[in-house]
């Protein structure tokens, strides 16, 4: 974290605002700007249901309800106002793309690819966790009644591979990556997809880390719509582990 802060202290301190190419008003951003896990929670959505256009100028996130990200953005920068009207598309201020590319030495068209994950794997735990939260929110399938784990499905094998590495760096047990064909929305042979599961032991550890993360950074930086189902699933994992540990102690005592 110290290394990250030192990098930002070298930025010009006389900067007093930032004008986004997509807006007419200036954003009020305090400099020197400290790059935090919250920034990765924001920029991480681009890997899932987002995309980058015009070399970081247009950062777009598509979701049925964009309100949680709007609220997070408004808490980060003064002057960011949003309407309560429900929309399925949100333009993220290009500032976040530019500052991320500058710090992580990424090109503008790389922040929605596996390269973002690759760079973050060497960052402190809270940064890695923030990025994983974004990926689970967009691409994870959490069924409290399904004991097979949290499924992450994507068509980009390399992204799934680096998500696996990200999970391993955090100590979360995962399955092997499996390949399958998704025939649901296609004709003919179907689209090739890749699936990774965060297993029960991984969910157990992730749950405790998520609780600590929320206490430090707030629930707005955590899971949003999938939070409720995650903790239902986590409680099942915690209960199973508790019973397993108890049985293990009883065996050793005999």
Regions from the PLM with identified roles:
Residues 1-254:
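Internal intein/HINT superfamily modules and their associated LAGLIDADG
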């Amino acid at each position: 974290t110290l290394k990250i802060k030192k990098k930002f202290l070298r930025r010009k301190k006389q900067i007093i605002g930032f004008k986004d190419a997509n807006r007419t008003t200036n954003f009020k951003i305090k400099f020197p700007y400290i790059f935090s896990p919250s920034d990765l929670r924001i920029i991480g959505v681009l890997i899932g249901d987002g995309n980058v256009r015009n070399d970081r100028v247009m950062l777009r996130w598509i979701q049925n309800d964009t309100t949680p990200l709007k609220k997070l953005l408004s808490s980060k920068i003064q002057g960011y106002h949003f309407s309560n009207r429900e929309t399925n598309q949100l333009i993220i201020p290009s500032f976040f793309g530019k500052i991320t590319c500058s710090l992580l030495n990424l090109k503008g068209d790389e922040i929605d690819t596996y390269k973002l994950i690759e760079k973050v794997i060497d960052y402190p735990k809270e940064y890695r966790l923030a990025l994983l939260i974004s990926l689970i929110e967009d691409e994870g399938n959490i069924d409290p009644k399904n004991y097979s784990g949290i499924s992450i499905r994507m068509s980009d094998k390399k992204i799934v591979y680096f998500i696996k590495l990200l999970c391993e760096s955090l100590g979360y047990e995962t399955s092997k990556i499996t390949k399958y064909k998704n025939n649901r929305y296609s004709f003919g042979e179907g689209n090739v997809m890749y699936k990774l599961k965060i297993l029960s032991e991984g969910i157990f550890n992730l749950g405790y880390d998520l609780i600590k993360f929320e206490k430090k950074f707030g629930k707005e930086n955590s899971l949003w719509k999938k939070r409720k189902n995650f903790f239902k699933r986590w409680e099942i994992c915690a209960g199973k582990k508790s019973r397993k540990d108890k049985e293990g102690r009883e065996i050793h005592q005999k």
